[in-house]
Each structure stands twice: as C-alpha cells, then as structure tokens.
C-alpha cells in the first residue's frame, strides 16, 4: 500500500522486525531509528487515495466498476507508477495485523501535546495533559496488540513452511492444472479460466501424501525492495534442499492454478460481488473470504519468478512459440524472448490474483472505516464534553483572579491616596507654623526697635535739655548719623528681605518642581505596570520624606541662623548704643577734632564696605560666567556624543538592512530556482502532489455524500 505521507512525517518503522515482504521506499534518514509502525498509512483509509493506483479495471475489460467512495488498496505497490515514489510502502503483515485487531494504522501514530492543545484552544493544560496521557496509553495498548498479532502471523507462516502438503491436495492441484492447460489459448483466456470452481479445503490437502507436493512448495518470501527475512529464507532453502529429489526442473515454483487453488473462490463470485467501498461489501459473500481468511494471501508474497518458471507457464510459452514459428516461418525464438513472454504471462496471472485479494480487502476495510467513524464520533463527543468542563472551570478561575486583583488594586490606590493627603496636610501645617513664627519674630523685632528708638529719643531729649548748644549740634550730628545708620540698616534689612524672598522663591520653585516631577512620575508609572508602580511609589515616598526632612532641617537651620543673627544684631545695636553714648560723651568733651575723626572713620568704613560689596559682586558674576561656560561646554560635549552615537546607529542599521535585503534576495532566488526545478520535474513525471490529492479526495468525498 502506498501511503501519501510527506518525507518529513515518515516514521520509517513497522510493528516489529522486518520479515517476508515488508517494503519501505525512500524513508528519510531522520526517521530510520523509529520504533513505531509506519501507521500513517491509515490516512489513506478515509482521507486520501493512494498515489500509485493499479489500473485493475482495465485488466477485466471494464467489466468491474470502481467504487465511488474512497477505498484502500493493499496491493498497489507492485505497479510501475509506485517505483521511485517518495512515500512509505507499508507491510502487508502490519496491515493484516491492524485489520485483525480492528485498529486503523493512523491510531498508532504518536501525537504531540501541542496538537491536542491546537485542536481546542480553550482547553486548559491540565485537561490537555490528561487527554494526551489517555491517548498515549490507548495507543501503546493498540500497538502492543498489533505487534503480538503480527508475530502470530509470522509464526503461522513458519508453520506453513514446515507443514507438508497432503497427496489429495497435490492430486487436486495436478488435475486442475491438466484441465486448465487445453483451454488456455491466449494469455487472457488462461488467466480467466485458471481459477477452480471452489477453494480446496486445507484439511484435505494435509491428509493425503503425494510426490507432487514438492512442486507446490513456495519459494522464499523475499521483499520487493531487496530486504529479505533471513529466517524465512533459510527455512525455505532447507525445505527446498530436502525436497530437491522429487521436485524435478520446477522444484521452487508455483503454478498460477495452484496459487488460485490456495484460497480464493471462482472469478464469477468475485465479479458478481458488490464493489469495494459500498455498503453491501461489509457482509461476506458465501465464496469470499473475510478479514480473518486473508491470512494465506496477505501473510506471504509470490514473486514473478515463482509464476514464470511453472510448468504450465513453460507449456504455454512453448505453444505460443510453436504458433509463431508456424505462422511466421521463423527458425526459433531466443531464450530472452521466452523469458520475457513467461514474465508477461506470470505478471498477468499475478494481477488477477491481486485483483481478487483487493476485492476482499476493500469490503473489510470499509467495515472497519464505518466502525472507526462511529468510534471517532464518540471520542469527539467525550473530548468536547471534557473540553467544555475544563473551559468553564478555567473561566471561573480567571474571573475569580481578576476580581481579587481588582480589589487589591483599588485598596492599594485608596491607601496611596490617603498617604498622599496626609503628607500634604503635614506639609501645609508645617508651612503655616513656619510663616507664623517668621511673622512673630518680625513683629517682635519691629516692636523692640520702636521701643529702643523711643528710649533713645527720650534720652536724647533729656540730654538736649542739659547740653543746649553743644547738645543741639551734637544732636544734629547724631540725627545725621542716625539717618545714615537707618538708611544703612534699611538697606541691610532690604537686602536680607530680598535674600529671604529669593530663598523662599527658590525653595517654592524647587518644591513645585519636585511636586511636578512627582506628578509626572506618578502619571508615567500609572500607565505602566501596577507592580512597578508600587515599587516606584515606595521609592518616591521615601525620597519625598527625605526631602521633607531635609527641608525641615534647612528651615530649622535657617530659623536658628536668623535667631542668631537677631541676637548678634541686638548685641551689635547695644554695643553701638554704648559706643554711641561713650562717643557722645567724648564728643561733648573732645569737641570738633573727635567729631571730624569719627566722620572720617565712618566715611572710610562706608567706602570699605562699598568696595567689599563691589568685589563680592564681581566675584559672583565671574563665578556665574564660569559656571555658565562650563555648562555650555558640557552640553556641547553631550550633544556631539549623542550625534556620534546616532550616526553610528544609523550606519549599523543601514548595514543590517543591506545584509537583510541581500539575504532576502538570495533566499527568493533560491526559492524561485527550486520552484522551477520542481515544476520541471513535475511536468516530466506528470505526478500529482500530496496537497492536490488531498483536495481531490475531499472533493470526491463531498460529491459522494451529496
């Protein structure tokens, strides 16, 4: 049988060790070590027709009609169309074992777990694994059963080799040969009249001994592809050596009539029987063998050498030679032409035998196909039921996990929102307390300043009353100095206020930037995975707490510094007040010289302070320019590095795209060349592809169902 199995799916192995007439054609190297049978041949039982189909109906002159349904041909690997085929030729022993066990060969093929998952995408892995284990256990049990049945078939063949034929069977075979010899006028008449009226019983053949039984001894059953069973070969050689004294010139041959006497009924019964593949072929006709009676034929193979060297074939060839010599006036026919004629006659006889065997096999396989379809429907219903249960359980689990995850996410979001609100509330309270403290300190300082000024004015008024002119002059000088000091103090206070405002603005800008960055980070993390959001929020919360603690420490430090500055200003003011009182007393005693000296000292101090302020401003501007230049240089360096990296990446991308295009063009050219080569070979061989055969089989099956 020819299995239309692609080379990549061949398993190249049988149910057991190869023996007798197993034949494997063109099995790829990666499948030679397989232990499983080449059971993919069952795909031809209900899926596709065989590739090399023997034109059997032509041999009968159109008298036998082919079956309209798909059928299985067990003996189509002898035709010339099957030679050179890429597909597996399975063993008749393996097929017979499958037929006896009511197992389709495709059921012995191993299937991957991915195939079961792909058949039903909704099934869970647990259900798929259970189905896979059940299928694998059932497959191994069927495989073991078929192997045991095949071993039993081989043992029956060995027993037949050692069992001598009875004299009654030998006499019946000789009588049938003598009766068929006169009626064989041509190759067609010989082949049609060589079948007996009824099959000879095996018990009668075993009962009576006869010297002619050696002529009916079969030759070694050799494989058609050159692979022979060494055990059967050695047994047949020993058998042939033991009977060589009685066999004569044709000791290792069968006649066509003796082969037909082995099991099969007359051709009239086979010709009048129902076509293979029809519904009526499921029942056995009175003269047709069932699947269990196919053992003698499907268990062994008869080569052309057995048929071409039989005495009947030799007599037929001699008669044809005499007729040709008489009609054409030729002197003689070469031995090579005689052998060719004998081979042609033997081939015709074997085709008739194979036709009878095929007719019986078609009926049995059609019955097996119907049973297999019913079993497959039951298995499919059970599989769909298990699949639906697994799908419902899986959907319930998924819904439960989805609800639990949603609740956890909502709870985490509410918890994060509460933490954020609490942190914002703490920050606002801290800012309010700090503002209140700053206002209180400013009011206290202003109140103390007013009290100090009032006290100074009262003291000055009392001293003015006692000191008159000098005091008035001193008061005038003091007021001028006080005005200058007030202006200087106002400038200092304005400077301090501006610095405080700048610091507050910078702090507020930094805080806003942090808040904006925080908001942007939260938005980006919310768009990402929720798991990474929790980790990022934790880190951001820690950073925010660190920032709040740092800002609190800075505010405390600034408050401490302001308080220290206030104390220092107060001490400086008190010190200045004491110095001023001493200076006023010295001025009152010393006069104009001391007053001029004080004026010069004050002017020098103001000038020095102005110079220091100008120098500090110049240094700050210089530092700012240096920082700006450094930042610009860093930006230029980063920009150049980025441009260089982009250029290198573009070059690499272009290089990869060129390589990809060249590889794609090379692959396309190779594919086009392969396609044209295959098309040329297909045109020359005029063979059908596997896909086309599958489509034709599906089309014929659909038309037959309609």
From Swiss-Prot:
A Pfam family of this chain: DUF4659
Modified residues (Phosphoserine): 310
UniProtKB keywords: Coiled coil, Phosphoprotein
The name this protein goes by in its record: Coiled-coil domain-containing protein 177
Chain residue ranges for the region called Disordered: 1-47, 183-292, 374-393, 398-425, 453-580, 607-634, 656-689
Lineage: Eukaryota, Metazoa, Chordata, Craniata, Vertebrata
Source taxon at top rank: Eukaryota
Coiled coil: 362-604
Compositionally biased residues, Low complexity: 38-47, 183-214, 242-257, 664-674
Comp. bias (Basic and acidic residues): 374-391, 453-483, 490-513, 542-580, 617-634, 676-689
